[in-house]
Amino acid sequence: MAKTVYVLNGPNLNTLGKREPGIYGGKTLADIEADCRAAAAGLGLEVEFRQSNHEGMLIDWIHEAGERGAGIVLNPGAYGHTSIALHDAIRAVSPLPVIEVHLSNIHAREPFRHRTMTAPVVAGMICGLGPIGYTLALQALAARL
C-alpha cells in the first residue's frame, strides 16, 4: 500500500492563475494538484491534496496527517509569516516530516515575508522555484520515508 502525503495549501492559493501571475505564475491550483499526483505516482506515493483559506482548517488537517499520513507538503501562504498556531500544530505532529513550499522567493519580497513562523519546525523549505517546488518537496519526502 502506498504511503499518503498530505499536500496542504493555505489562504488565497485557490486564486492561483489569476492572482499576481508575475509573482506566482500562471498555473492554477488544479494544475499544481495534477502535477503533484503525477509526481507522487512516480514516487510510489498517494496524495491527499487540500486548500483552505481558514487557519483552523489547516491545523485540523495537520493533526489528521499526523495520525494518517507519512508526511506533509505545506504551502501555508501568508499564514506562514504570522501563525504561531501552525507552528505549534507542526510541532505537535513531529517527527512527521513537513516540507514548507512557497511559490515565490519570500526573501526577495517585502521584509515582512522574509521570515516564517513555521520554518523552525519543518524539515526543510523550498521557495522561489514556482510550482516545481511542490514536486521537489514530494521527492524530498519520498527520500525520507
UniProtKB/Swiss-Prot annotation:
Subunit and partners: Homododecamer.
EC number(s): the record gives 4.2.1.10
Annotated metabolic or biological route of this protein: Metabolic intermediate biosynthesis; chorismate biosynthesis; chorismate from D-erythrose 4-phosphate and phosphoenolpyruvate: step 3/7
Functionally, this protein is described as follows:
Catalyzes a trans-dehydration via an enolate intermediate.
Instruction: Tell me which residues are marked as the site Transition state stabilizer.
Output: 19
Reactions the enzyme catalyzes: 3-dehydroquinate = 3-dehydroshikimate + H2O
Name the InterPro entries on file. Answer: DHquinase_II, DHquinase_II_CS, DHquinase_II_sf
- Where is substrate annotated to bind? 75, 81, 88, 103-104, 113
Q: Where is the active site?
A: 24 (proton acceptor), 102 (proton donor)
Q: Does the keyword Lyase apply?
A: yes
Name of this protein: 3-dehydroquinate dehydratase
Can you name the source organism? Answer: Chelativorans sp. (strain BNC1)
Q: Keyword Lyase on this protein?
A: yes
Q: Single Gene Ontology BP term?
A: aromatic amino acid family biosynthetic process
Gene Ontology molecular functions: 3-dehydroquinate dehydratase activity
Q: What top-level branch of life does the organism fall under?
A: Bacteria
